[in-house]
Design a protein with these regions (language model features):
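N-terminal Rossmann-like or analogous alpha/beta NTP/dinucleotide-binding catalytic cores
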Residues: 1-65, 176-196
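Charged/polar, solvent-exposed surface patches and flexible loops
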Residues: 2, 35, 58, 76, ...
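Non-catalytic terminal extensions that flank enzyme cores
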Residues: 7, 86-92, 96, 106, ...
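A short alpha-helix capping/helix-coil boundary motif
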Residues: 8-17, 165, 203, 218
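Short, surface-exposed acidic
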Residues: 11-16, 196-202, 249-254
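Hydrophobic transmembrane alpha-helix bundles
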Residues: 13-30, 49-62, 84-100, 233-249
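Alpha-helix initiation and N-capping motif
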Residues: 30, 53, 67, 71, ...
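Active-site cores that bind ATP or allylic diphosphates and position pyrophosphate for catalysis
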Residues: 48, 54-216, 224-229
Length: 274
């Protein structure tokens, strides 16, 4: 947040600014995630999973950049509500369970599927503002994903889906390596039976890479905004450079950049099927 503030980006509301939709740390929003989890459980969409990552990797097909599609080892034959308080404390061979979303038991709300192009109820689709029409088969490409980890932490997919809705987000913009996550998060929102007109639009942008084609990442000790700031780079210089690289105006003025912005400039529209 300090880096973004240095770059000149401000927020309508947030951790520093405050606002009506707080708290703004996910660690302070557990009650909201638990409420969503309880609702999904009432529909029989959760089950405990005792598998380790090593066991899953040994038998599961690979799902793009986001790990493995769970093979359903612990999935029950029928989706029924769990006694969450009991199941969370029930160890098996010394392991406590994660809670997974039961994709097999999931059915789209009728109003949701009536507004999507696909007639196959095992296929999820949405329009990405950059990559065009996206589809994924729920069983083959999405699978049963974790909603709560075995250590009790609410998983990324659940937290992001709930936050994006409750913050009334109009757009979710993130890296193209998270396209599969969007299918999962939209599935959560559909299972929560939320109105389609209150679901965000999604845009996945290409990743920033170095000269060798490797994406910039902390683990690779790649350049960071903090490093540029500490070496004396001026924020207006960086803003102007980024604007030119992205085909914007030759200016460091954020309002000018925003006024010149259009999704159509970056649309690839090729679509993909998973």
């Amino acid at each position: 947040l300090q880096d973004l503030e240095w770059l000149g980006l401000s927020f309508d509301e947030g951790l520093a600014e405050g606002g009506s939709r707080g708290p703004y740390r996910q660690s302070d929003r557990s009650d909201l995630y638990e409420s969503a989890l309880v609702y999904l459980n009432q529909q029989g969409l959760l089950y405990p999973c005792y598998c380790s990552r090593k066991e899953i990797a040994a038998v599961a097909p690979h799902a793009q950049d986001e790990g493995f599609v769970y093979p359903g080892t612990c999935r029950p034959l029928n989706g029924i509500p769990l006694d969450l308080e009991h199941i969370r404390t029930k160890a098996f061979n010394g392991r406590y369970p994660a809670l997974r979303f039961n994709t097999q038991a999931f059915r789209f709300p009728a109003y949701w599927h009536a507004n999507t192009p696909s007639k196959d109820h095992r296929v999820m689709s949405y329009h990405d503002l950059i990559y065009g029409h996206q589809t994924a088969h729920l069983d083959k490409a999405v699978g049963d994903f974790v909603l709560q980890r075995k250590d009790g932490v609410y998983a990324y997919q659940l937290a992001c889906a709930v936050d994006d809705y409750l913050f009334n987000s109009a757009y979710v913009v993130r890296g193209a390596d998270l396209i599969t996550s969007t299918h999962r998060q939209r599935m959560i929102l559909a299972a929560l039976e939320l109105p389609l007109n209150q679901i965000p639009q999604y845009a996945h942008v290409g990743l920033v890479v170095d000269h060798s084609g490797e994406r910039l990442a902390k683990r690779n000790q790649s350049i960071q905004l903090k490093g540029l700031r500490e070496t004396g780079v001026q924020p207006h210089t960086l803003r102007a450079s980024l604007s030119r690289i992205l085909g914007g105006p030759d200016s460091d003025d954020i309002d000018q950049m925003a006024n010149a912005f259009s999704w159509s400039k970056y649309s690839l529209t090729s679509g993909s099927n998973l």
